[in-house]
Amino acid sequence: MSIYVTFKGQVQKICISSGTILQELISTHYPNKNIIACAIDGIMADINTEINENQKIELYDFDSKEGQHVYWHSSAHILGNALVNLYQCKLVNGPALDEGFYYDIDIERPIREEDFADIEKEMQRIINKNIDFRKKMIKKDDLLKMYKDNDYKVHFINNIPDNLISVYYNDEFYDMCQGPHIQSTGLVKAFKILKSSSCYFLNSADNQILQRIYGISFPNKTLLKEYEEKVQKAKEMDHRKIGKELNLYFFHEYSPGSCFWLPDGVVIYNRLMEFLRKEYIKRGFKEVITPNIFHIDLWKESGHYQNYKENIYGISGEDFALKPMNCPGHCIIFKSVERSYKELPLRYADFGVLHRNECSGSLTGLTRVRRFQQDDAHIFTSKSSIKEEIENAIGFLKTVYSIFNFKYELFLSTRPTKFLGTIEEWDVAEKSLKDAIIDSGHTYTLNEGDGAFYGPKIDIILHDILNRKIQCATIQLDFQLPQRFDLKFKNELGMYETPVIIHRAILGSFERFIAILIESYGKHLPFWLHPRQVGLVTIDCKHENYMYTVEKSMLNVVLDLGIRKYTDPKDTLNKKIRKATLDGCKIICILGDKEMEKNEVNVRIGNKTRTYKIEELLEKIKVSIETKKEFIFN
């Protein structure tokens, strides 16, 4: 009998005998390929699974997402085993992450950094034993007896409908999980405990506080070293560190999660906003301003109160709340007058301030805040225009992200098990999204069944300079909200029709996007966006009047040009240049006798210099800002 095996895109037809174990096939046909995971007919499985005729087998090494997930899940089991051996704690949950793994435990004392060496030593002992991962199916009642002293595992078991539940053993250690796993603990060749923190069971503050221990592992030490170098680079580029050095913003205990933007930070914020405003005009968006406070009935009508109330800031003693999103306000605007098909698509953009009641433990610099603004837009359109509007949204996205040299990928999420509307409506909407993606020259990954109940969506995952994957943009179809607000427009036949809403954000929150920019560019933000575009450096005190002349000329051409002056007579020229460099000035203009005599400016970028006439320099600066291109020497 034969099967089809796929590895790294290459399909091979292989003849096998009855009862063949997949590991035997791998040893024979894929030696030295470091296969660590597999899928049989699209379902992830253990490598020691028996295979049958006509099955489709996919093999994965550590270079694949599937392989990494299995590898890190198995590493979490090794961590859990070590923690039980050391501390006799109660295990809760130990999943794989996009990068690494963690295990939550219930323990009487906190795990501190000084404990990491002991944990790593015990993990290494387990790894050195090269213990097999063995799967066993256990009856639910028997498993409840096995975990009778662990309320957390009992909770998970009781939420599993099946009577037979999979458990994985490593010698005497066992842990309930679906798997699959790598063959044995010895395949983990390099690992590190990263950090520990506290968390709540099931993420609810009403539940027990747990300890969460994070780790990372790799099949060789070279990959671990590369990871550590990447982490070190991320620390050096941390937006919290650079933001402080550039004096862009700060936070205060009197308003946790709400940023105090300083003048230079406001420059970046406003330039991003003005850039989008100009794009909105080109693309037919109408900017609106909606209230910050609404009666709670609005959030009940929209459905947000029922599903989102813990994140809504209410006003004590009043039936009002700060808005966490703009869409209900835009629905009120749409409904304020009778609408015709001639007005559609109607594109509302809103930079309004939003508040979300994030728990204090999750607040992280600019990436997780309570007060923020975003490039929020809602497009009210007919079903027939969905594809065109999605294409426009993707084109908008491409324009913006290309300016920042960001790579991205698209994920299409389709109809879930529970959904609003008809299957026919969903099929048409999903086809519109697929066609729009393809016609715009993009590819996509299908997340089948992962759409919201009110409509399919496109998630845009941005890759930053450290190749971290971050979601900022989203394009979401919504059949539900127009129905909740009873939105109507008159179609060509004079009949009332319900519009579709497209929720759309490109940058997402300005706070988070600025954090990404800082961590991608450091102090060297794009020239057009930078608050310190030009540093004026005088060689001597006698050149200060000329410096003010140059400054005035610059501001006459670009009113909001970010200029810093370095004139301290106690500083040498080299020290002034160094200060301007450390301040992040994109170009440094040195002014001395020669420049003053010839009405010129000596421009320095890094270690390169060039002399310009003032008029020539100003034109070059102006063009650089208008085109969003870097200022470079020709």
From Swiss-Prot:
A Gene Ontology BP annotation from the UniProt entry: threonyl-tRNA aminoacylation
Main location: cytoplasm
Localization of this protein: Cytoplasm
Annotated InterPro entries: aa-tRNA-synt_IIb, aa-tRNA-synth_II, aa-tRNA-synth_II/BPL/LPL, Anticodon-bd, Anticodon-bd_dom_sf, TGS, Thr-tRNA-ligase_IIa, Thr/Ala-tRNA-synth_IIc_edit
GO cellular component: mitochondrion
EC number(s) reported in the record: 6.1.1.3
Chemical reaction(s) catalysed: tRNA(Thr) + L-threonine + ATP = L-threonyl-tRNA(Thr) + AMP + diphosphate + H(+)
GO MF entries: ATP binding; threonine-tRNA ligase activity
Entry superkingdom: Eukaryota
Stretches assigned to the TGS domain: 1-61
Keywords linked to the UniProt accession: Aminoacyl-tRNA synthetase, ATP-binding, Cytoplasm, Ligase, Nucleotide-binding, Protein biosynthesis
A UniProt-annotated Pfam family: tRNA-synt_2b
Signal peptide feature range: none
Family: Belongs to the class-II aminoacyl-tRNA synthetase family.
Cross-referenced PANTHER family: THREONINE--TRNA LIGASE, CHLOROPLASTIC_MITOCHONDRIAL 2 (PTHR11451:SF44), THREONINE-TRNA LIGASE (PTHR11451)
HAMAP family, sorted: Thr_tRNA_synth (MF_00184)
Name of the protein in its database record: Probable threonine--tRNA ligase, cytoplasmic
Source organism (scientific name): Enterocytozoon bieneusi (strain H348) (Microsporidian parasite)
